[in-house]
């Protein structure tokens, strides 16, 4: 089975749907398709179904610029985000272009044919399917959907209760009245604890957040009161645009302040924790051993985690795991924490391009040896884009302008009769650091060796800066001397 499309998008999550909407709106006559491994669209927001799952960025900036998020809720729940993505796909007619249940294994470029051949397997039937396209766009994110990161905990087989990972939450898990230990201190852990603990029916008897080291945690309002008031008098579009611009500025200023005055911002963040939990709190449980934004900050709506801890329904323990026991976890300090259920909120496994192999003119494409061009295209990879969002701001801010840039690129190629566009480095700009070099999170460190390289200068640097990226992607000339164009197969030789 072989089908040809002008544009083929791998992944029907937040980035894939957004990119498809851009291309469909700009080029209504182009044939496009999305290949999605799961049986529903939504990507992360269909996969993650653990209690309390929500965005960790405000929805004004996490939503698409071209389709406003029309709610004053700041951090939305996972089901609402998935529905927003689905509604967007329906509105733009993208939902009809998705091929579900397909695991893409290889993509092979032929300079002679000027096209990609993409091979995958329909997992429900085992049928091999082949697609060809003029332009290929990967929107698969950067983590492995099959398995989250799980350290090799000693004695885990001895534990008599149930051990689960948030990435694959069991639908039948009943934690009501149970003693729960959540291992971890990142965004997933600080979301799970208040969602599972408390006095509501179905809540756990007690939840212990067991962390090796603390993370920075700060509170955001659950509801955007300013937008709520403005919405009574102004059109939704105006309210959304104001809220979006304001929040982009706040995100950027917070990040810049943490980088410029890290010790001051550290004191302010810790002061806020002490203010919410009281002066008697053991601050060693909330004082990280790194500076703000060396790792991503954890946002909690209306301080829900702090309220849960203050109520006694949950607690925090900072220690290291010696071994799992029949009844729970024995820490290196000698303390044993009893548990009926252990949740290993221990992070993600990095995976590039959804695990897809790239082959360019018969040669294996070595992604860790290449750089990204403007954070969107890949060095020496013809007619290929890779959409990756921000790690220091809302993911969608970057994926949105990347989709708009691709439309500019495709328009430039069409207007000038080009069939191929390939970024080439003629100045040896590659550095021996990964593209996320500004972030020291565990999952980034574990995945350094499989990521593309960071470049020494533009356009090979990954900036993680919305205003600068917006100018580069939306305003700067497409033809910059680094991006090489060819009008026919014989004019193009891939490196």
Curated annotation (Swiss-Prot):
> What's its EC?
1.14.13.-
Q: Name one GO cellular component term.
A: peptidoglycan-based cell wall
InterPro entries per the record?
FAD-binding_MO (IPR051820), FAD/NAD-bd_sf (IPR036188), Flavin_mOase-like (IPR020946)
Task: Give the protein's cofactors.
Answer: FAD
Q: Where is the signal peptide?
A: none
State whether keyword Cell membrane applies: no
- Phenotype when the gene is knocked out: Inactivation of the mymA operon causes altered cell wall structure, reduced contents and altered composition of mycolic acids along with the accumulation of saturated C24 and C26 fatty acids, and enhanced susceptibility to antibiotics, detergents and acidic pH. Also impairs ability to survive in macrophages.
Induction per UniProt is: Expression is controlled by VirS. Induced at acidic pH and in macrophages.
Reply yes or no: does the keyword Cell division apply.
no
Tell me which UniProt keywords the record has, alphabetically.
Answer: FAD, Flavoprotein, Monooxygenase, Oxidoreductase
Q: Name one GO biological process term.
A: biological process involved in interaction with host
Q: Which residues cross the membrane?
A: none
Q: Name one GO molecular function term.
A: N,N-dimethylaniline monooxygenase activity
Pfam families per UniProt = FMO-like, NAD_binding_8
Residues at the site labelled Transition state stabilizer = 296
- Which enzyme class? oxidoreductase
Q: How is the cofactor bound?
A: Binds 1 FAD per subunit.
Kindly list the positions annotated as binding FAD. 15, 36, 45, 56-57, 104
Family annotation (PANTHER family): MONOOXYGENASE, PUTATIVE (AFU_ORTHOLOGUE AFUA_8G02570)-RELATED
Q: Which family does it belong to?
A: Belongs to the FAD-binding monooxygenase family.
Reported function: Required for maintaining the appropriate mycolic acid composition and permeability of the envelope on its exposure to acidic pH.
| Name of the protein | Putative FAD-containing monooxygenase MymA
| Source organism (scientific name) | Mycobacterium tuberculosis (strain ATCC 25618 / H37Rv)
């Amino acid at each position: 089975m072989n089908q040809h499309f002008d544009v083929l998008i791998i992944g029907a999550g937040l980035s894939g749907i957004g990119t498809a909407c851009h291309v469909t709106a700009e080029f209504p006559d182009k044939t496009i398709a999305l290949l999605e491994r799961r049986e529903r669209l939504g990507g992360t927001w269909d996969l993650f179904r653990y209690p309390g799952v929500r965005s960790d960025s405000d929805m004004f900036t996490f939503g698409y610029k071209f389709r406003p998020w029309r709610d004053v809720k700041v951090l939305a729940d996972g089901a609402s985000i998935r529905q927003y993505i689905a509604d967007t796909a329906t509105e733009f007619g993208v939902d009809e272009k998705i091929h579900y249940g397909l695991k893409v294994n290889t993509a092979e470029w032929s300079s002679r044919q000027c096209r990609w051949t993409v091979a995958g397997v329909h997992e429900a039937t085992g049928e091999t399917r082949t697609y060809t396209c003029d332009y290929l766009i990967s929107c698969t994110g950067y983590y492995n959907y099959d398995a989250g990161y799980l350290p090799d905990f000693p004695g885990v087989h001895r534990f008599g209760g149930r051990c689960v990972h948030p990435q694959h939450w069991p639908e039948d898990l009943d934690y009501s009245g149970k003693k729960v230990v959540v291992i971890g201190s990142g965004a997933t852990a600080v979301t799970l604890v208040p969602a599972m603990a408390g006095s509501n029916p179905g809540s756990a008897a007690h939840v212990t957040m067991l962390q090796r080291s603390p993370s920075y945690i700060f509170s955001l309002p659950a509801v955007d009161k300013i937008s709520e008031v403005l919405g009574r008098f102004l059109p939704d579009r105006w309210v959304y645009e104001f809220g979006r611009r304001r929040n982009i500025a706040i995100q950027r200023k917070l990040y810049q302040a943490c980088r410029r005055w890290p010790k001051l911002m550290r004191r302010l963040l810790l002061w806020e924790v002490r203010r919410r939990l009281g002066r008697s709190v053991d601050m060693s449980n909330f004082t990280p051993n790194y500076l703000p934004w060396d790792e991503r900050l954890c946002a909690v709506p209306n301080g829900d985690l702090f309220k849960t801890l203050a109520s006694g329904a949950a607690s925090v323990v900072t220690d290291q795991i010696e071994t799992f026991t029949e009844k729970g976890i024995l820490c290196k300090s000698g303390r044993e924490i009893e548990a009926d259920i252990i949740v290993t909120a221990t992070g993600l496994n990095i995976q590039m391009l959804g695990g897809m192999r790239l082959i360019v003119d018969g040669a294996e494409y070595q992604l860790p040896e290449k750089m990204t061009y403007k954070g969107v295209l890949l060095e020496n990879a013809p007619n290929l884009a890779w959409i990756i969002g921000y790690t220091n701001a809302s993911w969608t801010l970057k994926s949105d302008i990347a989709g708009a840039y691709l439309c500019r690129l495709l328009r430039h190629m069409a207007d000038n009769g080009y069939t191929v566009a390939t970024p080439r480095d003629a100045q040896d700009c590659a550095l021996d650091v990964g593209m996320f070099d500004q972030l020291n999170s565990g999952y980034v460190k574990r995945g350094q060796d499989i990521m593309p390289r960071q470049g020494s200068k533009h356009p090979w640097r990954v900036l993680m800066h919305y205003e600068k990226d917006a100018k580069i992607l939306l305003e700067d000339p497409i033809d910059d001397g680094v991006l090489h164009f060819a009008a026919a197969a014989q004019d193009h030789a891939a490196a």
